[in-house]
Amino acid sequence: MLKEYNSLIFELSKEGKKAYTLPPLDVEEKPLEDMLPKEMLREKEVDLPEVSEVDVIRHYTLLSQKNYGVDIGFYPLGSCTMKYNPKINEDMASLPGFTELHPYQPEETVQGALKLMYELEKALCEITGMDRFSLHPAAGAHGELTGLMIIKAYHEHRNDKKRKKIIVPDSAHGTNPASAAVAGFDVIEIKSNKEGAIDLEALKAVLNDEVAGLMLTNPSTLGLFEENIVEIARLVHEAGGLLYYDGANLNAIMGISRPGDMGFDVVHLNLHKTFSTPHGGGGPGSGPVGVKKELADFLPVPTVEEKDGRYFLDYDRPLSIGKVRSFYGNFNVMIKAYSYILTMGAEGLKRASELAVLNANYLKEKLKGYYKVAVDKTCMHEFVLAGLAEKSGDVRTLDVAKRLIDYGFHPPTIYFPLIVEEALMIEPTETETKETLDAFAETLIKIAKEAKENPELLKEAPHNTPVRRLDEVLAARNPVIRWTK
């Protein structure tokens, strides 16, 4: 019987099945043709499944039980900061005073919401060392694009229109090159040195009067802090460029160091990562962009301002890049992030970063000897393994990741960053206990032993999932995302 609930909801359909019977119409019936233009009307009925209520409930309940999230288990997805999200944040975001707002309400009726946005901006400025923030961008890559548009507007306002190049290290966050290209820049990639840091000589070689800026993730996607960051900032600024901070890895440095103090001019953050709001299917996200005062005039409109205790939206910003999305950003996510910041406080945020770094280094040391470490030095909040320490037939990182699923763990990020062969990128976050980290490490060690003793066990994993190993290349290149008869 359970087998049929492994089917698509459409495959459960049987003609004549009904979940509800509607009562007789008690108002005058009107043809749709009288109310809607012809081009908006279907020529045939929509092909919806015919199922009973119990079919629907069982189908979606069983689907939910097959799901995996941070509330179920350890989720060490590198470069994603899958930390536990305190439920008080959800309670705050569910308050009727927030949920019943409408973006078209007069400003006088939404003073509390505007104050929250204003105070959140101030908090983010304090955490990052920036002077102003826009809360509009919907997620990280949208924040990147917004920040790059600000950089472009800044150079064009100075009539320095030849600056068409953005430098991106090979260890940068994965979306950086794409965002730069979408913003209309030419992307110049520079290689990392053997320590996983930016090669200063390689940077000097590409800096010139055509460079608009350098995009940098610090710590990098190798989980390493860029120790020469002050010198890098000096070189970029002397060449007339701006320094852009991708906030993907801010969780490692809250309360310890600030991008603004390092010399960054523009930053974007991920409220859905660092500031504990659900993501990875539990969205939406939020990617605020912060700038130094020299760039504040270019921020998207509207900004939230305060005068004599009254909060208002300011559209009168002639140099602004304009609107980057409808309304004012993903407000629900802002509530959760602000709740998290207030709950943690300055010392709590600092402690969170310290524990994130401690957990990552603890795991790395436990796994050394069984797996190769890409750059074997003290890491920040995450680290990158480079496959098994001892080659076992043709067992690959993909096989290790699939085998982890059999043991109840979500696999880490694999094959990223691209500069590491057989990469396994692990970010434990600060919210996991030593017991969880030990269990995860013991499982990875057990898998390393299995790879030597029974490699086929890994090659055929996972063994215990409703769907076994998929052809992921085929799924990516030829996705079937729509059901048809």
UniProtKB/Swiss-Prot annotation:
GO cellular component terms, semicolon-separated: cytosol; glycine cleavage complex
One Gene Ontology term of the molecular function aspect: pyridoxal phosphate binding
The enzyme's E.C. designation: 1.4.4.2
Keywords: Oxidoreductase, Pyridoxal phosphate
Classification via InterPro entries: GcvPB, GDC-P_C, GDC-P_N, GDC_P, PyrdxlP-dep_Trfase, PyrdxlP-dep_Trfase_major, PyrdxlP-dep_Trfase_small
Annotated SUPFAM superfamilies: PLP-dependent transferases
Cofactor: pyridoxal 5'-phosphate
Pfam families hit by this protein: GcvP2_C, GDC-P
PTM sites of type N6-(pyridoxal phosphate)lysine: 273
Keyword hit for ATP-binding: no
Oxidoreductase among keywords: yes
GO biological process: glycine decarboxylation via glycine cleavage system
Domain of life: Bacteria
Coiled coil feature spans: none
Catalyzed reactions per annotation: N(6)-[(R)-lipoyl]-L-lysyl-[glycine-cleavage complex H protein] + glycine + H(+) = N(6)-[(R)-S(8)-aminomethyldihydrolipoyl]-L-lysyl-[glycine-cleavage complex H protein] + CO2
Family statement drawn from the similarity comment of this UniProt entry: Belongs to the GcvP family. C-terminal subunit subfamily.
The protein's role, per its UniProt record: The glycine cleavage system catalyzes the degradation of glycine. The P protein binds the alpha-amino group of glycine through its pyridoxal phosphate cofactor; CO(2) is released and the remaining methylamine moiety is then transferred to the lipoamide cofactor of the H protein.
Subunit structure: The glycine cleavage system is composed of four proteins: P, T, L and H. In this organism, the P 'protein' is a heterodimer of two subunits.
Identification of the protein by name: Probable glycine dehydrogenase (decarboxylating) subunit 2
Encoding gene (name): gcvPB
